[in-house]
């Protein structure tokens, strides 16, 4: 089971792919309603599965993974950051010495981050998305401004 949502820019379509043994897939297919996926969503998935589109998506995913690792290392080196959790997604969980000031600095730069401070054991934690290079630069700038 694999999502097409985030990595393939189809978040609104709510699509995924399921691969498996034909016998298992047959059992699952029997449980599906007659038209389980809207036609526009199917068209988007079919367009995505074209070789050229898959190649572009793979390049973008690789670039995002590289930016994520670089961003994690950069943030972890800043004095205002206590911890950056390992991530397999397109976001990072970052524990800050002053999360409120970091959030304000991000807002001033047109960036939204999610405050996780109210969650148990996550005091001072923000979830930051790995954006495009310009967004990533503004994010680092916001963290550095608070440090």
Where do the protein language model's features map onto the residues?
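Short secondary-structure capping/turn micro-motifs that flank functional sites
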Residues: 44, 66, 91, 122-123
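Hydrophobic residues at beta-strand termini and immediately following loops
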Residues: 1, 84, 128
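Residue-level detector of anion-binding/catalytic polar loops
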Residues: 112
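Short acidic/glycine-enriched loop/turn segments that link adjacent beta-strands
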Residues: 12, 88-89, 120-124
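PLP-dependent aminotransferase class I/II
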Residues: 1-77
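PLP-dependent enzyme catalytic core of the Aspartate aminotransferase-like
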Residues: 105-109, 118-147
């Amino acid at each position: 089971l694999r999502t097409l949502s985030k990595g393939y820019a189809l978040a609104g379509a709510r699509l995924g792919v399921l691969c498996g043994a034909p016998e298992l897939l047959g059992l699952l297919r029997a449980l599906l309603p007659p038209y389980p996926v809207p036609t526009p969503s199917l068209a988007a998935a079919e367009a995505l599965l074209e070789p050229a589109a898959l190649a572009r998506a793979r390049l973008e995913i690789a670039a995002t993974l590289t930016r994520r690792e670089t961003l994690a290392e950069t943030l972890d080196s800043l004095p205002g950051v206590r911890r950056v959790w390992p991530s397999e997604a397109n976001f990072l969980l970052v524990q800050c010495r002053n999360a409120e000031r970091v959030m304000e600095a991000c807002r001033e730069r047109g960036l939204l981050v999610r405050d996780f401070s109210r969650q148990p054991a996550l005091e001072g934690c923000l979830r930051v998305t790995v954006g495009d290079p310009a967004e990533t630069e503004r994010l680092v700038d916001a963290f550095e401004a608070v440090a």
